[in-house]
Amino acid sequence: MIIQQWSLLKKTKSFEFSFEIGGFYSRDNYKIFNQDRFIIIQNMGAPGLITDANKIEISDLEWDKFWNRIDLLGVWNWEKDYIDKGILDGIQWELMIDKKGRKRRRIYGSNKYPKNFEALTNLINEISKMNGEIMGYSED
């Protein structure tokens, strides 16, 4: 029993995931992150003001599928920043993924997105059970 608990604790502490997207005073500002095996979803009406929050337990199998798809999307090879300097306001986003002891990336964007960003937002919608609430922006 103790070995099973240690194995579970070790697995849940082996990664971090965080994704934020939204615009200044937009009603669709989201922060989605893991807390051990759980996904925490915060909807912020204004910067720093949480208007709604949910906590969903994610199975080990779902987490394994999530990380496999992160690998398939090539997110580890994305640029550090995607910024459209011609637009001063709009949509900003940030992704932080950390496979403890293996890989870590923090990627930021402002009105610009990697080519397969929409596939990432679909994946995040899927694991967070948000039914498409995060819009799938894409680079044209």
Question: Where do the model's predicted regions map?
Answer:
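Generic short beta-strand segments
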Residues: I40-Q42, L72-V75
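Short, well-ordered, aromatic-rich surface patches in folded extracellular/luminal domains
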Residues: M1-G22, I56-E57, L61, R69-I70, ...
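Acidic/histidine-rich, surface-exposed loop or edge segments in extracytoplasmic proteins
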Residues: F38-A53
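Hydrophobic/aromatic beta-strand elements that line small-molecule binding cavities or substrate pockets
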Residues: D28-F33, A53-I56, W93
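Aromatic/basic micro-patches that form nucleic-acid/chromatin recognition or nuclease catalytic surfaces
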Residues: F66
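Short, solvent-exposed coil/turn segments at beta-strand boundaries
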Residues: K31-I39, K100-G101
